[in-house]
Regions:
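Membrane-interface helix-boundary motifs at transmembrane edges
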Residues: 29-37
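Membrane-embedded alpha-helical segments of integral membrane proteins
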Residues: 1-29
Length: 255
C-alpha cells in the first residue's frame, strides 16, 4: 500500500496531471482525434493556470491550517512532546551528515523550544525513511544530532524510526507511548498536516493536545489571481492537494 500511494501521488499531483493531460492530448490529436486532443490540451492549460497563477491552493491549505488552533497559553507543565517527521532533507542528511532542515523545519525547532522550556518532558520523534527506496537514515535517528547539539539529553529522546506515513506514525507512536508509560502529550506537526494527524491519533486512541506549527498561509487569503509567485503557488497547491487526498483516502479506507 505504501508504494501504491507513492506511485499514485506521482501521477495525480497537479503538475504531473497537467503534463499527462497535455501529453495525452498530443497523442490523441496525432491519432486524428483533434477535437478531443484540443480539449485535453485545454484542460492541461487551465489546470496550469489555476496551479501557477491563482490563490486556489493557498485557500485550500488555509482551510486545513484553521482546523486546529494552538492553545492560547502554553501549559505550565508538559510531560511528553510528540513530533512527526517530514522536517528533514533525508537524502542530503544521509549523504552529508549533520542536519538539513526543509520547509517544515519548524516542527523540530518548536519541539526544541518546548524541550528547553520543559526540561522534564520526554520527546518522541516519530518518523523513519519515507522514500520509495528506503535507503536513507530516517528522521528519528538523524534528529538526535540536532537535539543533543542544543543541550537536550539523549536519554530524553524516544526515537520511533519505523513509520513511513502518518498512519504508521499513529500506530507506532501508540506502541511507544505504552512501552514508555507516557501520557498527556502535545503533538507537534505542520498546521496543514494537523487535521489528518489528529484524526489518525484519535482513531488509534491516543489523547494528544494539538500544537500546530509551520503555517504556510496568512490566514486571511482570498480566492483570486496571483501572478507574482508561480513557483510558490505551485508548491502550496501541491501540498494542499496531497493533504486533501490523504484525508479522503484515509476516510474511504476506514483509517
Amino acid at each position: 500500500m505504501f508504494l501504491v500511494s507513492k506511485i499514485f501521488w506521482l501521477a495525480v499531483q497537479p503538475l504531473s496531471l497537467a503534463f499527462l493531460l497535455s501529453a495525452l492530448g498530443a497523442l490523441v490529436a496525432f491519432a486524428g482525434w483533434r477535437r478531443i486532443g484540443a480539449t485535453l490540451s485545454g484542460l492541461a492549460a487551465a489546470l496550469l493556470f489555476v496551479v501557477l497563477y491563482t490563490t486556489a491552493g493557498g485557500v485550500a491549505l488555509q482551510v486545513l491550517e484553521a482546523r486546529f488552533a494552538r492553545p492560547a497559553e502554553e501549559p505550565a507543565r508538559i510531560s511528553c512532546i510528540i513530533v512527526l517527521g517530514g522536517a528533514l532533507e533525508n537524502e542530503v542528511t544521509t549523504s552529508r551528515g549533520g542536519i538539513e532542515l526543509n520547509q517544515a523545519g519548524e516542527r523540530f525547532l518548536e519541539t526544541l523550544r518546548l524541550a528547553i522550556r520543559h526540561p522534564d518532558a520526554r520527546i518522541v520523534v516519530s518518523g523513519g525513511d519515507g522514500s520509495m527506496t528506503g535507503d536513507y537514515e530516517g528522521e528519528a535517528a538523524a534528529s538526535e544530532r540536532l537535539f543533543t547539539a542544543f543541550g537536550v539529553s539523549p536519554e530524553r529522546l524516544v526515537k520511533e524510526n519505523a513509520s513511513r506515513t502518518t498512519y504508521e506514525n499513529s500506530l507506532q507512536t501508540k506502541d511507544v507511548l505504552a512501552r514508555e508509560g507516557l501520557t498527556d502529550c502535545v503533538l507537534v506537526t505542520s498546521a496543514f498536516h494537523m487535521p489528518r494527524s489528529m484524526a489518525l491519533f484519535r482513531k488509534a486512541g491516543i489523547p494528544v493536545t494539538p500544537w500546530p506549527v509551520d503555517y504556510r498561509t496568512s490566514g486571511i487569503l482570498r480566492l483570486g489571481v496571483d501572478f507574482s509567485q508561480p513557483t510558490s503557488n505551485a508548491q502550496i497547491t501541491s501540498t494542499a492537494v496531497r493533504e486533501w487526498i490523504g484525508l479522503v483516502a484515509y476516510y474511504l479506507t476506514g483509517r
